[in-house]
Amino acid sequence: DRFMPQMMGPSIQPGATGPVTMAGAVAQGVAESMFCVVVAQLRQKGCPVGLGCNFGILDMAQGLMSIGSPEMSLGLAAQAEVAQTLGLPTWGLAGATDAKCLDAQSGAEAAFHILAQGQAGLNLIHDVGYMDMSMACGVEQLVMSNDVIGMAKRFLRGFEVSDEHL
């Protein structure tokens, strides 16, 4: 009623709460997100919406969704492509890690996901600084990820090639 933007957020865990294949999981995630878009539009025509879905695989040992897995970025990039085709903004997560402390794993996972989501063209990236499969937030992780975000933005800008610049 107040025209608040709605950010759809189903969470599909391939092989646990959704199809085991990434293609099947993305199809289910997009379908669930689109259902939410329809409900939002039925409730308030013209309501701003953003498409999104989590696609982390299930860590069977801990019973938690892995936010550091490559499948998370694969799924987010695929749903972003669908959203862009439909002219909808999209969201996802990056700068998060399965690691419990700031270490090589946390840096590698954060950097990979930040660059992957930047290249996929997501409009809104959240959960920066999340650690331990989203069970904690680390200020150190947030600061490090902020630096990586700056590097990724610079990388994605590229550079100009022209007679003047040569």
Which sequence ranges carry the predicted segments?
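Helix-rich catalytic cores of soluble enzyme domains
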Residues: 1-123
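C-terminal catalytic subdomain
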Residues: 90, 99-166
